[in-house]
Amino acid sequence: IGVRLVGSEMCIRDRYIIWISEIILQQTRVVQGYDYFLRFMNRFPDVDALAAASEDEVLKCWQGLGYYSRARNLHAAARQIVEWGGFPERYENIRQLKGVGDYTAAAIASFAFGLPHAVVDGNVYRVLSRYYGIEEPIDTGHGKKYFAAMAQELLPEGKEAADYNQAVMDFGAMQCVPKSPKCEDCPLVDGCAAFRDRRIQELPVKSRALTVTERYLHYMYIEVGGEVAVFRRESNDIWKGLYEPFLIETPAACAPENLLNDEKVPSFIRSDKAVMTYLCGGVRHQLTHRTLICDFYKVELADRPDDFGRSVCWVKKEELSNYAFPRLVVMLFEKFGLW
């Protein structure tokens, strides 16, 4: 985004745009992030607007992009920038912003300020490892340092550095893609070690496979007189800062007829006064390291209970859309017309 979405003719005032776009692109492809980028920029057109917003407002605008720690870090960093009196212009100072690592700091330094810092993202890892036939794993500390040093050595001097950075990233995103790269019309194919040695699919190398765990969620949409009980996730877990219906998590799958026996189910849900409806089950939602398997219930009560054991917000059904919910919850609400 930034240079990649709004064009390469950037002036110095666009450092804010570049920063926001690079944070969005940390875990999101350009084609997926474009509309979110425009929405975010429309809602928070400058760093002062972002810093002045509440965390709930920022998370609501970010809703659907995932990896919500990015939004929380953006918000915190915006307040850092305001406190400092302006956007930092040196790599070392940019690196001190909340949520900004080596890659993002290099991207901002290069694209916003024309500083000679190599930008190394997944596309760059892939291009360099394939072209030079490098077997160094890209997901280890040593490997990351190896590729960063190599990219820095290859970086041209002067004003061409930013264009070179952008060119390699774009080449990886459009030509040397992860699966089925376009080798037949690649301008670099004659010098490509991976093509020559038929190792396209083997490179880049990763040292460890991704471990995915399953989690079993049972959401209860509790409604009393047109108001719905929602809860803000506060722990350092998935979706921190977002809202959700009442949740019971079990270590394994649990059939509806057995769920009421779980000690985490409040007594008011077990009572004869509660009207509980099983809406759907086994809904799978994939996160990077987790597979969420969700059952969804609706519970209708005559009076507000007072023994949730945690802080609750009672929200009018028609106002639920003002709150930031995980995509999984939004899909369930929409499927059953619950907001």
Locations of the language-model features?
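Gly/Gly-Pro- and Ser/Thr-rich, intrinsically disordered tail segments characteristic of DNA damage-repair
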Residues: 19-20, 40
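Contiguous mid-protein beta-loop-alpha structural module that forms a pocket-lining wall or clamp
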Residues: 99-213
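Intrinsically disordered, low-complexity, charged terminal extensions of DNA damage-control enzymes
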Residues: 8, 173-339
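Alpha-helical ds-nucleic-acid-binding substructure associated with the helix-hairpin-helix region
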Residues: 37-98, 102
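ATP/adenylate-binding site constellation spanning eukaryotic-like Ser/Thr protein kinases
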Residues: 7, 55, 121
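A short secondary-structure junction motif
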Residues: 22-35, 67-69
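Short, polar/flexible loop-turn hinges at active-site or ligand-entry regions and domain interfaces
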Residues: 8-9, 31, 65, 84, ...
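Single conserved hydrophobic/aromatic residue that forms the stacking wall/gate
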Residues: 1-7, 12
